[in-house]
Design a protein with these regions (language model features):
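Short, well-ordered beta-strand core segments
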Residues: 28, 52, 181-183, 198
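Conserved acidic, metal-coordinating active-site core of Asp-based
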Residues: 85-178, 182, 186, 190-192
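Asp-based phosphoryl-transfer active-site loop
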Residues: 1-11, 175
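Short glycine-/acidic-enriched loop or helix-start segments at secondary-structure transitions
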Residues: 9, 39-41, 63-64, 174, ...
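Short, structured coil segments at secondary-structure junctions
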Residues: 24, 46-48, 56, 122-124, ...
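Asp-based, Mg2+/Mn2+-dependent phosphohydrolase catalytic module
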Residues: 185-219
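Active-site phosphate-binding/coordination module
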Residues: 11-98
């Protein structure tokens, strides 16, 4: 995960990510609810291969190939229905949050959640996921866990060899398929319940602790 996992409480990338990740001697998959350019840019700035799961599993990039898994038609229709009921996604006319999204729509946490969920309830196969940073309106068939299976297959790595670290409900599907899973102390209840363990520290403090333990075990 990126937000809440490689960041500080204020949302900035923690400097320790640039110390710990560039030379990590195993594949690193950057998984996020953000649109595709964000994790690709992070991988590039860290000098890591572009192994990316974006939009909560809607876009996958592995071995130089990008696959768009989700269909944005139904999520976009839900947001239009939300607007029709008087709802406002809040982001404003420029809306850089959604500008590059290909499979889902993100709505601000300041928006009317109950109205948004009511609009989604009237659609087939659409879910609203609260990541703690936005409400993500997406297809029910899209998840980070399914995307990780796709990445693992492309890399020919057993799913049991993956260690997942995250902080919100959109990571529960990943925790269900990875060999080891850690919810950070700042994680929501869904992530905590799905993880194998919950760290005592929050944000990058917790992530750094997991990485230190993994390194110690490999020596």
């Amino acid at each position: 995960d990126i937000d809440g996992t490689l960041t500080t409480a204020s949302g900035r990338i923690d400097a320790r990510a640039f110390e710990l990740l560039p030379d990590w001697d195993a594949p690193i998959v950057f998984a996020t609810g953000k649109s595709f350019p964000y994790p690709v840019a992070l991988a590039q700035f860290l000098g890591r291969p572009e192994l990316v799961i974006a939009e909560n599993g809607g876009v996958v990039h592995v071995d130089g190939e990008t696959t768009v898994v989700g269909d944005p038609t139904a999520p976009r229709a839900v947001v239009e229905a939300f607007r029709g009921r008087g709802g406002d996604p809040i982001w404003g006319p420029e809306d850089t949050v959604n500008r590059w999204r290909e499979t889902e729509v993100a709505v601000s946490l300041d928006a009317d959640e109950s109205l948004l969920r009511a609009a989604a309830a009237g659609a087939d196969d659409v879910a609203v996921v609260d990541t703690g940073y936005a409400y993500h309106v997406k297809s029910t068939g899209v998840s980070k866990g399914r995307a990780l299976k796709r990445v693992a297959g492309a890399l020919d790595i057993d799913l049991g060899a993956f260690v997942a670290i995250g902080d919100s409900e959109n990571y529960a599907s990943t925790f269900a398929v990875a060999g080891e899973s850690y919810a950070l102390a700042n994680a929501d209840d869904t992530a905590r319940d799905a993880a194998d363990a919950v760290t005592s520290a929050s944000y990058m403090d917790g992530t750094a602790g997991v990485l230190a333990d993994l390194r110690n075990r490999s020596e």
